[in-house]
């Protein structure tokens, strides 16, 4: 939501600064929302899919090693348990027992040796992409809405107020994970967002004056 809000807030303010019509600002905002949301969702899909394919390949290689070099994998299992503080004799005995079941040995090796959690492979790349699209769109629509219903400086003022409020809520929500002060985090988010929008608005003004001149 934060990426969508900041990027589209900056975009519509830049276009508004160039003295574009209400329709022009709204069109730019809609284009920014769709382009950004699609880009984010595609990036998320590629990221999740690539990670899953990488993990699956590593798991296949580990199974090949179990089939072709069981003694070497048995030693690796023993070393894993010894690293956890288990005595050597007991670690070797545990490794021997585990190697009787290659499926179990494979699960333990990919988790302990490769750090792969098989549960992560069950996640849907498409679900992640849709979730990313929705989050971006929710943030991006906040600065866009005023230009769909209002005109002139009224639209700009309402856009700034609505966006600042949204930025504060996002900053405050982040404190649930960081433990930071709600007011500090919220106002910091507002400050950065307003600064970005002010810069693009100023650039838009300069471009508008230059074109008009």
What are these regions (language model features)?
Residues 1-12, 119-145:
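Transmembrane alpha-helical segments and their cytosolic interface motifs
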Residues 48-132:
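Cytosol/matrix-facing amphipathic helices and coiled-coil assembly/linker segments
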Residues 21-30, 153-159, 213:
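Membrane-water interface of transmembrane alpha-helices in multipass transporters/channels
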Residues 202-213:
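Juxtamembrane boundary at the C-terminal end of a transmembrane helix
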Residues 3, 42, 81, 91-94, ...:
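Residue-level signature of catalytic and energy-coupling elements of molecular machines
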Residues 1-47:
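Internal alpha-helical transmembrane segments
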Residues 27, 31, 35, 39, ...:
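Alpha-helical transmembrane segments in multi-pass membrane proteins
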Residues 161, 165-180:
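Transmembrane alpha-helical segments of integral membrane proteins
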């Amino acid at each position: 939501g934060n990426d969508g809000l900041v990027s589209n807030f900056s975009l519509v303010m830049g276009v508004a600064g160039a003295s574009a019509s209400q329709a022009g600002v709204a069109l730019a905002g809609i284009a920014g929302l769709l382009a950004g949301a699609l880009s984010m969702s595609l990036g998320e899909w590629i990221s999740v899919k690539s990670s899953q394919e990488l993990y699956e390949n590593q798991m296949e290689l580990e199974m090949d090693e179990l089939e072709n070099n069981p003694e070497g994998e048995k030693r690796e299992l023993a070393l894993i348990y010894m690293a956890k503080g288990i005595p050597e004799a007991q670690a070797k005995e545990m490794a021997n027992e585990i190697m009787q079941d290659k499926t179990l040995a494979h699960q333990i090796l990919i988790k302990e040796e490769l750090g792969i959690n098989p549960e992560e492979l069950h996640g849907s790349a498409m679900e992640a992409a849709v979730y990313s699209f929705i989050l971006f769109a929710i943030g991006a629509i906040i600065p866009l809405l005023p230009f769909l219903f209002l005109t002139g400086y009224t639209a700009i003022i309402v856009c700034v107020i609505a966006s600042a409020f949204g930025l504060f809520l996002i900053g405050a929500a982040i404190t649930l994970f960081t433990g930071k002060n709600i007011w500090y985090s919220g106002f910091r988010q507002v400050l950065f967002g307003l600064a970005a929008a002010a810069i693009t608005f100023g650039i838009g003004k300069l471009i508008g004056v230059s074109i008009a001149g």
